[in-house]
Amino acid sequence: MGSESLVHVFLVSFIGQGHVNPLLRLGKRLAAKGLLVTFCTAECVGKEMRKSNGITDEPKPVGDGFIRFEFFKDRWAEDEPMRQDLDLYLPQLELVGKEVIPEMIKKNAEQGRPVSCLINNPFIPWVCDVAESLGLPSAMLWVQSAACLAAYYHYYHGLVPFPSESDMFCDVQIPSMPLLKYDEVPSFLYPTSPYPFLRRAILGQYGNLEKPFCILMDTFQELESEIIEYMARLCPIKAVGPLFKNPKAQNAVRGDFMEADDSIIGWLDTKPKSSVVYISFGSVVYLKQEQVDEIAHGLLSSGVSFIWVMKPPHPDSGFELLVLPEGFLEKAGDRGKVVQWSPQEKILEHPSTACFVTHCGWNSTMESLTSGMPVVAFPQWGDQVTDAKYLVDEFKVGVRMCRGEAEDRVIPRDEVEKCLLEATSGSKAAEMKQNALKWKAAAEAAFSEGGSSDRNLQAFVDEVRRISASLNSKSSAVGYVKSKINGVVEYVDSKLNGKAAPVEEANTRTNGIAKVEQPKAANGKVEIAELTPINGKVEIAELKPINGKVELVES
């Protein structure tokens, strides 16, 4: 079956690496279930995705379906530094996106790939408005935990007290969740947060939350059962994670902006089981130079082997390039590797990896849990502080190295060493590993055929197919043709008494196909005479309602 014959969903992503990865993973899951998926984002990161992952213009087969890519220009210069300022960039992305996405949808329809559903991720809620304007359904992929979805929901609607200028240290009790201390609440909700633009960007989706017919989440029922069941009474959520595990798309295209250093796997192969600490703080967290120095000295003192990912900052970010202490690599020798970007999924699944020192972003959290990997929690801001609370206190797979930006301190080398040793040896490490393997088994059961997430995703796919069939039946309900002129039934431009003139008749036809061109309207209405099929086919070029009406009448 060719890709053009499949039900088509159109995914629109914000440009952040932490947004692209889960939405692309969802796209591959949907394709594996037999859909045609188009993944779309701005060209400024599209060019990096093409370069790092070998993306081409051809649809790529994934399971029973296909995935393809389209990128659009945001109309800013390639090196425009304002992309780093969300208060400036998000309005620009919305302005351009609301114009170009409908054009892309129309072009796909003209090329035989009509779109049946749009799906977006946070920061670009206007995609739901675009879908609504086109008469298409929309869905949204939430890229944080169900607990954070609930926290933002209750904050936005003022349902429970949160830290405020009058009560900075207010703990937060949300139904079906453990008590969150003030510094365990998503930090963008702090009244003193230095990132108010991120609060605005995230909460923007909540103003549009009634428009998507489904909110998909990269989590699974068994992991967050109580809060998922509670939130399901407030909004149409479906847990479909972990998305990064896809048995039908093991070698499918990735969305990394930098090419991963796969040679590191060969080095890992030479190390003993559970002996290597993996350190990565994601795609947007940049530490102070002083903190990097303390982590480096703590690593050397602990004696553990390690892989440390040190991603260089974006040239326009304003961050300085971090450097390692003098002589660090020489002292570490063959027991340490420092890389710019890594194949994280492969490292976390490798038997030589002992634990993951992580910023606790949700993508990394899901990858560690699904890989059965204990963690050392090093959250900085946003949902990371909430995820760290769950990893350590609820899922019991981690030790906490810091509490995030509210703590506002550099973690000294002796504490770094203590946490590394606690996570890699002794009874605490064994207990964490046992719990991590339990969550790995639960995650694998969830995404396996017939598991909770697989059932939820299949239900979503079935609903998209049902909607697609309904859309197709409406578009084909314009009528049937009796009259033929040179094998083509045509509407004429002339009007009689303010109505479109009747169709001329002829006795010939071509290929047994009747074609209906766009009729002209009079008095704000389009009136269509009775049409009958020829050899069971009627092809309609385009019918546009005038004043919101298309009327069918029998002749």
UniProtKB/Swiss-Prot annotation:
Biophysicochemical property: pH dependence: Optimum pH is 8-8.5.
Name of the top EC class for this enzyme: transferase
Chain coiled-coil ranges: none
Alphabetically ordered keywords of this record: Detoxification, Glycosyltransferase, Transferase
A Pfam family per the record: UDPGT
Residue positions of the active site: 19 (proton acceptor)
Keyword presence, Glycosyltransferase: yes
Protein residues bound to an anthocyanidin: 19, 382
Binding site for UDP-alpha-D-glucose: 344, 359, 362-364, 367, 383-384
Annotated SUPFAM superfamilies: UDP-Glycosyltransferase/glycogen phosphorylase
Thermal behaviour (record text): Optimum temperature is 21 degrees Celsius.
GO biological process: response to toxic substance
Keyword Membrane: no
A Gene Ontology molecular function term of the record: quercetin 7-O-glucosyltransferase activity
Signal peptide: none
Superkingdom field: Eukaryota
Function: Broad spectrum multifunctional glucosyltransferase. Catalyzes the formation of cinnamic acid and p-coumaric acid glucose esters during fruit ripening. Accepted substrates range from derivatives of cinnamic acid and benzoic acid to heterocyclic and aliphatic compounds, resulting in the formation of O- and S-glucose esters and O-glucosides. May also be involved in detoxification of xenobiotics.
Family as reported in the entry's similarity comment: Belongs to the UDP-glycosyltransferase family.
Protein name: Cinnamate beta-D-glucosyltransferase
Annotated source species: Fragaria ananassa
